């Protein structure tokens, strides 16, 4: 049976993610105490219900991170496919969302300010984030989060999932990256008026960067680094690794390098491609 655990920071969009799972046909349970998870799975199996499970767990249920990891290992040992999704956002964004909704933080009744509650929650959940696929919703609306969840679920995983993500430094760096590479030293197609309207997915930009020795050296170097260290992360039972590749605006160089690297890693690892700034890309 496939089981998806959804966790993350309050105000980051866990409820939206869970509703998306429900719309996709998952049997969803919100705020389930973790000690009840094996019983829920057993009950589901006894009913001969083939519907996949999605369960939201967070600080409201007094989540014990050590227990969470034990439960995940236990269920995987029984042959179940357990995936973990962690939803987060930047602190300033969360503060704004709480202010707009006028809702209190789940930990705010413990004599803590909102900022203190957010910091405590982030520290508390960090060990769970380490084994999860992370979605940062800081610059997302509900529809974009739903799309990100659907894209993640499309990838069939049997081993380590490598997320290759392009981004623009001027919009901020992704906080869920395991490895980050800076492409701003490469020749920039943006300064060519004929190339500016395109992205790193388009043939004119590919032709331009294919002809730049520095760009090819960069791809070679990242490929060597990634293929050197990914096996070590696999040995540590990591399920997801995010490789973030940035340029100034996240439209040309970083997109090109991600796509180029994906072609080289295809067949060796399960890949998920994300372009944070280049939302509407045409194919090469």
UniProtKB/Swiss-Prot annotation:
GO terms for molecular function: ATP binding; GTP binding. Gene3D superfamilies: P-loop containing nucleotide triphosphate hydrolases. Keywords: ATP-binding, GTP-binding, Nucleotide-binding. The keyword GTP-binding applies. GTP binds at residues 58-61. It holds the Pfam family PapZ_C. ATP binds at residues 8-15. InterPro entries: P-loop_NTPase (IPR027417), RapZ-like (IPR005337), RapZ-like_N (IPR053930), RapZ_C (IPR053931). Belongs to the RapZ-like family. PANTHER family: RNASE ADAPTER PROTEIN RAPZ. Displays ATPase and GTPase activities. This is Nucleotide-binding protein NGO_0315.
């Amino acid at each position: 049976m496939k089981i998806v655990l959804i966790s993350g920071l309050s105000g980051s969009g866990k409820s939206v993610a869970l509703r998306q799972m429900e719309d996709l046909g998952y049997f969803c349970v919100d705020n389930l105490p973790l000690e009840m998870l094996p019983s829920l799975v057993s009950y589901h199996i006894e009913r001969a219900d083939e519907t996949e499970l999605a369960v939201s767990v967070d600080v409201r249920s007094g989540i014990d991170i050590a227990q969470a990891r034990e439960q995940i290992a236990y269920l995987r040992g029984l042959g179940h496919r357990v995936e973990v999704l962690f939803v987060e956002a930047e602190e300033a964004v969360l503060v704004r969302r709480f202010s707009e909704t006028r809702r209190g933080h789940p930990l705010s009744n413990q004599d803590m300010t909102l900022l203190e509650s957010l910091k405590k929650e982030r520290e508390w959940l960090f060990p769970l984030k380490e084994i999860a696929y992370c979605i940062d919703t800081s610059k997302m609306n509900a529809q974009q989060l739903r799309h990100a969840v659907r894209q993640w679920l499309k990838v069939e995983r049997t081993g380590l999932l490598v997320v290759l993500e392009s981004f623009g430094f001027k919009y901020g760096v992704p906080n869920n990256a395991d490895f980050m590479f800076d492409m701003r030293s490469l020749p920039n197609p943006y300064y060519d008026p004929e190339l500016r309207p395109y992205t790193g997915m388009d043939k004119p930009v590919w032709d331009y960067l294919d002809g730049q020795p520095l760009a090819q050296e960069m791809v070679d170097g990242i490929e060597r680094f990634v293929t050197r260290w990914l096996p070590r992360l696999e040995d540590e039972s990591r399920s997801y690794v995010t490789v973030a590749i940035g340029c100034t605006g996240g439209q040309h160089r970083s997109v090109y390098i991600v796509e180029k690297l994906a072609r080289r890693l295809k067949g060796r690892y399960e890949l998920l491609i994300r372009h944070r700034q280049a939302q509407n890309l045409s194919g090469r």
